[in-house]
């Protein structure tokens, strides 16, 4: 009787890109082509920046299509100033017409999305791709991670850094699977803000304990050399109305400082 021996299964080995310097990254909100011109002012007004991530790519349909605002002039100017460009891709702009589950659960749409992103990265000489998928849920989470694996392979083959944005770890978002992200991605970025947000209860945007917890919880699953923590350069001023309703206004650091002085508020 012939004995058939099953081949031993071996986990794939994912190599990673790791920078030999501290990454000082800023996201740059770009809503149209004209907004790309702001990069001249952004770099002129910023010190110590190593990396910028413009919001350039938007999931546009359920078949892996993307909308792009990429600019060669933008990339060239950043490179001339020693700043890397990691193009951000998100699922927010067209959230009413796209479905993450449909995009990520089909091999054909995942492959098309990967191909589209890699093509844009090569065409515009991008240094990296930054994933900002904020509407993943338990149903789409496994398919999303499969997409992340497939994208990471193509990024690695083309020398493109892959970073992934994540909420501060909490029970309601554990399905993002940071452990697997920490294996296949080059960097895992904690969005260490929005502890309290517009429409919610008043409170800090990013209290010390909240930020600390986000970092510590992420480090339980992701190698420390891959973790980047993002801090807000804004705060919120909360106003409670007579009827008990609450509203808030986001303010940048300079404006918030002026507001405190104008209202003679003592900080502690």
Regions found by a protein language model. Name each.
Residues 17-34, 58-207:
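Chitinase-like catalytic core of GlcNAc-active glycosidases
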Residues 187-190, 196, 212-240:
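Active-site region of glycoside hydrolase catalytic domains
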Residues 3-11, 235-268:
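Glycan-binding loop/region signatures in secreted carbohydrate-active enzymes
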Residues 1-51, 80, 164:
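Non-catalytic accessory regions flanking glycosidase/transglycosidase catalytic cores in CAZymes
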Residues 168-172, 208-212, 234-240, 248-250:
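Active-site glycine- and acidic-residue-rich loops that bind
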Residues 40-46, 175-184, 220:
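Mature extracellular/periplasmic domains of secretome proteins
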Residues 10-11, 35-39, 70-72, 175, ...:
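Short alpha-helical segments and helix-capping/turn motifs at coil-helix boundaries
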Residues 50, 127, 225:
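Short acidic/polar active-site loop segments enriched in Thr and Asp
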